[in-house]
């Protein structure tokens, strides 16, 4: 079958999204939100830099490297959840685990990106409701507390 490049790209994206949804379930939606947040942060940062005549290819490149590092951290979080699940299931340790590290990490990064987007919007001259930034900070603290709580429980059990 000879598909044109646009159809081939659509088919590949559809297959990728279907595979992720099949593999990750509801976490695929969270992953998609994170990817969108990263893109919006990069775009809003670019717009803010251009508006303020401060755009620099080196800074843009550093931003992309930062995003690449975030992707690696999220992959480590997903692998961590996978290993904990497999060990609990396969070694008969009686651990019932559906994953905590991956969604918490994604949520933390989504809120961090949202905060960065708001900072970029301020640089664009947009007024931000103070309660919105407060909600983001409170939510980040809650995610940190949940992550720390889970880590503390693991340390205590050893």
Language-model features and meaning:
Residues 9-22:
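Alpha-helical phosphate/pyrophosphate-handling elements in metalloenzyme active cores
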Residues 34-44, 70-78, 105-116:
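Alpha-helical transmembrane segments of multi-pass membrane proteins
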Residues 43-53:
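Juxtamembrane membrane-interface segments at transmembrane alpha-helix termini
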Residues 52-74:
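Juxtamembrane helix-capping/reentrant segments at transmembrane boundaries
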Residues 54, 58, 88-96, 123-126, ...:
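Membrane interface segments of multi-pass transport proteins and intramembrane proteases
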């Amino acid at each position: 079958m000879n598909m044109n490049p646009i159809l081939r790209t659509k088919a590949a994206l559809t297959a990728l999204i279907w595979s992720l949804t099949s593999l990750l379930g509801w976490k695929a939606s969270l992953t998609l939100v994170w990817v969108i947040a990263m893109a919006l942060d990069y775009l809003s940062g670019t717009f803010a830099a251009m508006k303020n005549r401060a755009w620099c290819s080196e800074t843009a490149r550093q931003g992309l490297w930062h995003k690449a590092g975030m992707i690696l951290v999220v992959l480590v979080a997903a692998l961590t959840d996978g290993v904990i699940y497999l060990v609990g299931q396969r070694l008969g340790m009686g651990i019932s685990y559906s994953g905590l590290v991956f969604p918490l990490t994604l949520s933390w990064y989504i809120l961090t990106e949202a905060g960065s987007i708001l900072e970029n919007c301020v640089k664009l001259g947009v007024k931000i409701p103070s309660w919105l930034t407060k909600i983001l900070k409170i939510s980040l603290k809650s995610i940190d507390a949940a992550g720390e709580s889970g880590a503390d429980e693991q340390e205590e059990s050893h």
